[in-house]
């Protein structure tokens, strides 16, 4: 049995294959996922697992350089936005870097998911609970 925190074989495989600047998406239950992009569906029911739970586990094994959010999250889901920024700040401190965060429209966000290595779907059912994580390097 794998000893690390991340036990899901599909998620672990995607993270292990990431190169510098490759992207993965962690999303809520409603984000449309492009047919050509690998879909890893972790959603069991509404709210299980949460977006932040999935983000927390994935980022324990992924070196993150930057993150992309839909600009709508700021007004439409401010509580989750604050929690997400806090989690990214804490991750950056743990990694020894500053994770840059950029914002694009939700339409542009959906288009950008086509360029991701995978989309990991959570059971989150709150608006704009989505992030594109851009891989960094550990050296």
UniProtKB/Swiss-Prot annotation:
Pfam short name (any one): RbsD_FucU
Reactions catalysed according to its record: beta-D-ribopyranose = beta-D-ribofuranose
Organism expressing this protein natively: Serratia proteamaculans (strain 568)
Chain's role: Catalyzes the interconversion of beta-pyran and beta-furan forms of D-ribose.
Highest taxon in the source lineage: Bacteria
Pathway in which this enzyme or protein is active: Carbohydrate metabolism; D-ribose degradation; D-ribose 5-phosphate from beta-D-ribopyranose: step 1/2
Protein name: D-ribose pyranase
Active site per UniProt: 20
PANTHER family tied to this protein: D-RIBOSE PYRANASE (PTHR37831:SF1)
Lineage: Bacteria, Pseudomonadati, Pseudomonadota, Gammaproteobacteria, Enterobacterales
GO molecular function: D-ribose pyranase activity; intramolecular lyase activity; monosaccharide binding
Assembly, per entry: Homodecamer.
EC number(s) stated in the UniProt entry for this protein: 5.4.99.62
Cysteines joined through disulfide linkages: none
Gene responsible for this protein: rbsD
């Amino acid at each position: 049995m794998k000893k690390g925190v991340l036990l899901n074989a599909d998620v672990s495989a995607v993270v292990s294959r990431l190169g510098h600047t490759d992207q993965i998406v962690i999303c809520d239950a409603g984000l449309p996922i492009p047919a050509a992009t690998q879909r890893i569906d972790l959603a069991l029911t509404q709210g299980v697992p949460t977006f932040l739970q999935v983000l927390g586990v994935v980022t324990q094994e992924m070196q993150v350089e930057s993150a992309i959010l839909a600009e709508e999250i700021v007004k439409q889901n401010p509580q989750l936005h604050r929690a997400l920024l806090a989690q990214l700040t804490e991750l950056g401190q743990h990694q020894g870097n500053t994770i840059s965060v950029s914002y694009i429209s939700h339409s542009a966000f959906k288009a950008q998911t086509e360029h991701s290595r995978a989309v990991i779907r959570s059971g989150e059912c709150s608006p704009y609970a989505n992030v594109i994580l851009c891989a960094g390097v550990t050296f």
